[in-house]
């Protein structure tokens, strides 16, 4: 029993590539012959060995991951830092291929109606004037801050003036109504203002030396804590908004009024569907005007409405203000326009109902005022031109490759003197010489045949005579004849026949 046990035990030093299945295979036979206690001891020892093997394999895998990914566990120079192990688990991330996008990119109006600009702005991109988009860090992108906040932070916001006015009104009202602030000193008012600020505003106030810069100026301000607070607010407003409301308040009011006059005079509305938007913009600049000139711009509000609706509203507004039915204010003008629009919408809904249930023939009715030379406004029918697509042909694989030749020109050019070629019989000297190309003699009688430049032609003629060839000038024999095929038109052939007759 003991000998068998020694043979079964594995060595204390283990190889890295040892498999646990082999260990169980070797010991399964021996365990059958052991007692229960011996089996327990043997299994316990095997489990320890397996744990050592797994720990060693885990450390090896971590070392390989570190070498491959070059993970820095700790950025500190000291050795006390706690090592952060990388996550080696691979999670199954579901694929999004074939799924519908969360944002409908393929809409007809997506690229042209400004939807793409909004989509790009949400992701930190801003459209440039020259075209294209530029990426802006998130911390430098202006945000819209809640105006009900009790903390003043003017860093990178797009509604700084409105936020400043809301913050000033809230704390100013609290200083006036709360009796707790009646006995506040100048230093306590300064600290109170500084406490409810953040960012650049708080840094600006903290950099001020209270004893030399703040205290002397606050001492000159007459009034209670609210007057002191208002002085500090005017300093902040001039620093961050850029307007000196302390010494040049009237000049600022005049500038705002001039800006409002220009804006109201150039506003235009052509569609009453945008009446609410028109009202919001008009009201904003209307109350920047001085109280004396506002009555003129109430009528301008109605005159800018599309004709003849604007003229009708002007008459109704004057009539109702004279009867004291509505107030002679901008609110009264807005009210009469909205009531008229509501009544018109109700009448149109009735017309649709009646038109669908009962047919009314109004054409040709003499009681209806006629319109001479006028045409009814009809909606233009939308037509779409069919796009011509280039037709594609599949190659005919079964056809053999052909050689293409240049096409011959079969069009015949008309000759100046159509007919048979001129034949020069023997005895007549009207044909041209083959050597000098002059009329009056034959080639064998050419006086220029002895010249150097004509020797080649003369030699050719002599060789032809030696071979038995005769020129066309000589008469044809009875045995051999030479024929020439000439293609002629039907008209020319008929004329020649008449001449021969």
Swiss-Prot record:
It is found in: Virion; Host nucleus. A zinc finger (CCHC-type) spans 431-448. Belongs to the caulimoviridae capsid protein family. Keywords: Capsid protein, Host nucleus, Metal-binding, T=7 icosahedral capsid protein, Viral penetration into host nucleus, Virion, Virus entry into host cell, Zinc, Zinc-finger. Residues 78-98 are annotated as: Disordered. One of its GO terms (biological process) is viral penetration into host nucleus. This is Capsid protein. InterPro entries: Caulimo_coat (IPR001988), Znf_CCHC (IPR001878), Znf_CCHC_sf (IPR036875). It comes from the Viruses. SUPFAM superfamilies: Retrovirus zinc finger-like domains. The keyword Zinc-finger applies. PROSITE patterns: ZF_CCHC. Self assembles to form an icosahedral capsid, about 50 nm in diameter, nm, composed of 420 subunits of the viral capsid protein. The capsid encapsulates the genomic dsDNA. Following virus entry into host cell, provides nuclear import of the viral genome. Virus particles do not enter the nucleus, but dock at the nuclear membrane through the interaction with host importins. GO terms for molecular function: nucleic acid binding; structural molecule activity; zinc ion binding. A motif (Nuclear localization signal) lies at residues 122-125.
């Amino acid at each position: 029993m003991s000998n068998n046990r020694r043979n079964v035990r594995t060595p204390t030093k283990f190889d890295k590539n040892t498999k646990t299945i082999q260990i169980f295979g070797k010991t399964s036979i021996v365990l059958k012959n052991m007692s229960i206690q011996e089996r327990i001891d043997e299994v316990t020892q095997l489990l320890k060995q397996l744990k050592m093997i797994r720990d060693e394999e885990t450390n090896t895998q971590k070392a390989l991951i570190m070498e491959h990914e070059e993970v820095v566990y700790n950025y500190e120079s000291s050795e006390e830092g706690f090592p952060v192990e990388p996550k080696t688990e691979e999670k199954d991330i579901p694929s999004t291929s074939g799924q519908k996008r969360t944002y409908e990119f393929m809409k007809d109006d997506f690229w042209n109606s400004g939807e793409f600009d909004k989509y790009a702005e949400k992701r930190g991109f801003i459209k440039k004037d020259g075209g294209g988009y530029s990426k802006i860090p998130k911390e430098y992108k202006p945000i819209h801050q809640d105006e009900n906040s009790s903390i003043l932070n003017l860093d990178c916001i797009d509604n700084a003036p409105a936020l400043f006015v809301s913050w000033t009104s809230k704390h100013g009202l609290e200083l006036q109504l709360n009796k707790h602030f009646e006995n506040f000193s100048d230093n306590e008012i300064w600290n109170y203002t500084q406490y409810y600020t953040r960012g650049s505003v708080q840094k600006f106030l903290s950099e001020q030396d209270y004893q030399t810069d703040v205290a002397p100026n606050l001492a000159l301000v007459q009034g209670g804590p609210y007057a002191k607070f208002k002085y500090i607010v005017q300093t902040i407003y001039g620093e961050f908004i850029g307007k000196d409301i302390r010494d040049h308040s009237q000049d600022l009011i005049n500038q705002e009024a001039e800006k409002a006059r220009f804006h109201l005079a150039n506003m235009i509305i052509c569609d009453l569907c945008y009446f609410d938007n028109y009202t919001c913009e008009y009201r904003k600049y209307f109350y920047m005007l001085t109280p004396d000139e506002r009555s003129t711009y109430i009528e301008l509000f109605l005159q800018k409405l599309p004709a003849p609706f604007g003229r009708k509203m002007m008459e109704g507004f004057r009539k109702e203000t004279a009867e004291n039915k509505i107030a002679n204010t901008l609110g009264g003008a807005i009210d009469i326009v909205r009531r008229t629009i509501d009544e018109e919408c109700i009448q149109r809904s009735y017309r649709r109902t009646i038109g669908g249930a009962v047919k009314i023939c109004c054409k040709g009715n003499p009681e209806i005022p006629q319109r001479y030379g006028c045409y009814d406004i009809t909606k233009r029918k939308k037509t779409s031109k069919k796009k011509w697509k280039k037709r594609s042909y599949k190659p005919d694989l079964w056809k053999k490759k052909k050689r293409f030749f240049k096409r011959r020109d079969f069009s015949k050019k008309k000759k100046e003197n159509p007919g048979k070629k001129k034949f020069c019989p023997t005895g007549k000297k009207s044909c041209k010489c083959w050597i000098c190309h002059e009329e009056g003699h034959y080639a064998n009688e050419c006086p220029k045949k002895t010249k150097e430049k004509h020797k080649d032609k003369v030699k050719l003629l002599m060789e032809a005579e030696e071979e038995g060839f005769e020129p066309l000038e000589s008469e044809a024999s009875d045995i051999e004849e030479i024929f020439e095929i000439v293609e002629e038109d039907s008209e020319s052939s008929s004329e020649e026949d008449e001449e021969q007759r």
